[in-house]
């Protein structure tokens, strides 16, 4: 494979395009297609990250502030069915370099147990406004954080934003998963909510036209 071919391959496959939003209340009737995720970060610096993730599809774990990543894995290790290793670059304008490949789940489980900074969350899939959304409900030190993401194969413009989204977090590095692994939301939630109350919610104006959906 030539250098030009590798560059073309990276351009086609190795980027993610997403917008992210804070959720404070996620309706129970929308909590469909759950996936338990535990992931550990072995490098996280200025937007660059190296991550190992293990997950169990169809598992709706009841996560709370006491749900540490290792205790959750101890309870559900036998249900882990998929694992990946991922390299990420800094996010700019809702676009981020991301290269990912599959791992043997048993090897990945041992890696998560043996090092890195781990976090746990349950991911739900929601269809809203013509887009598929992922809604992550965090446990452990990041409880009670909930983040909704809309990802497309190209820039996420002219978005219909669900009613459960409170304010946009796109490109706010504090809310990147690698930042949350090292500086969990539970330690600064009060300060952030005070900041949000002072500044008010926002939607980015540089991604085309935003529309608000009515509650489902």
Which residue stretches match the model-derived regions?
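Phosphate-end processing signature that detects enzymes handling 5′-triphosphorylated RNA
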Residues: 2-216
């Amino acid at each position: 494979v030539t250098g030009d071919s590798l560059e073309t391959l990276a351009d086609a496959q190795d980027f993610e395009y997403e917008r992210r939003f804070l959720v404070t209340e996620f309706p129970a009737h929308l909590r469909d297609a759950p996936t338990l995720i535990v992931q550990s970060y072995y490098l996280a610096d200025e937007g660059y990250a190296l991550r190992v993730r293990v997950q169990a599809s169809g598992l709706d774990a009841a996560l709370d502030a006491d749900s540490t990543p290792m205790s959750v894995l101890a309870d559900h290790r036998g249900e882990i069915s998929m694992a990946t290793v991922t390299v990420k670059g800094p996010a700019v304008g809702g676009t981020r370099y991301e290269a990912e490949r599959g791992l043997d789940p048993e090897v990945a489980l041992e890696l998560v147990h043996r090092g890195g900074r781990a976090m746990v969350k349950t991911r739900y899939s929601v269809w809203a406004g013509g887009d598929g959304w992922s809604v992550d409900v965090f446990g452990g030190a990041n409880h009670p954080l909930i983040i909704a993401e809309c990802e497309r194969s190209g820039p996420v413009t002219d978005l219909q934003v669900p009613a459960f989204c409170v304010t946009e977090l796109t490109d706010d590095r504090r809310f990147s998963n690698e930042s949350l692994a090292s500086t969990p939301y539970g330690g600064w939630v009060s300060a952030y909510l005070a900041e949000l109350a002072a500044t008010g919610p926002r939607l980015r104006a540089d991604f085309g036209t935003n529309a608000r959906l009515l509650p489902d």
